[in-house]
Amino acid sequence: MRILISNDDGVNSPGLAALYAALADYTECVVIAPDQDKSGASSSLTLDRPLHPQTLANGFISLNGTPTDCVHLGIHGLLEREPEMVVSGINLGANLGDDVLYSGTVAAALEGRFLQRPSFAFSFLSRQPDNLATAAHYARLLVEAHEQFDLPPRTVLNVNIPNLPLEHIRGIQLTRLGHRARAAAPVKVVDPRGRAGYWIAAAGDVEDGGAGTDFHAVVQGYVSITPLQLDRTYQDGFSSLNNWLEGRR
């Protein structure tokens, strides 16, 4: 099996290196990752300029694009042999609850699944690499076990690993996405020439983080696994809309 590895922290991220090291002695791996940090890129594709891959000294391929670009090109002809799986991460920072809407890490996995490859997104609950070996351990464990899952064909597994030594992890929990409150307002700044600018502020506080959510699992010391689907259709919305449409047909 050939695995395509990508991320949104960039090709020089220690999380990417740890993921590659964990998987490369299990199976063949190729890395295509953004040439700079693309956190928050979501599923964006680069359409306003050409993409230029560059092979680095360590064999990783750096691309001047988004995580989704990396996976799209990796499956659509950049490689001599197409990968059979996509693994994204290890992100330095959580992708919990509503974070998945913005995450380039999750988006890379979604693109892989959209292009009919089993896909994982792995995130580690720290910006520092101190317990990164724990995340790498669970990435290897789940990738090796993927054929036993029997998942629906348009499903991605979003995995978040606590910042703990391996021996302190309490286990693995299957979870749903929690939810955050509204994000803080952007922060206005003024440059030396008097021009206004804005920094996007931090994500909102956890609003729905009770038992059964990904937020709750990681706080309790568990690895959280949340199945995500590509189809975002909200079936429960049909009935109320149908009632409104009945008299207008």
Curated annotation (Swiss-Prot):
Q: Does the keyword Transmembrane apply?
A: no
Task: Output the InterPro entries linked to this UniProt entry.
Answer: SurE (IPR030048), SurE-like_Pase/nucleotidase (IPR002828), SurE-like_sf (IPR036523)
User: At which positions is a divalent metal cation bound?
Assistant: 8-9, 39, 91
Task: List its EC numbers.
Answer: 3.1.3.5
Keyword entries, A-Z = Cytoplasm, Hydrolase, Metal-binding, Nucleotide-binding
Q: Which cofactor does it need?
A: a divalent metal cation
Main localization of the protein described in the UniProt heading: cytoplasm
Q: Where in the cell is it found?
A: Cytoplasm
| Function of the protein | Nucleotidase that shows phosphatase activity on nucleoside 5'-monophosphates.
Family the UniProt entry places it in: Belongs to the SurE nucleotidase family.
Entry protein name: 5'-nucleotidase SurE
Query: Whose protein is this, by species?
Result: Pseudomonas syringae pv. tomato (strain ATCC BAA-871 / DC3000)
Upper lineage is: Bacteria, Pseudomonadati, Pseudomonadota, Gammaproteobacteria, Pseudomonadales
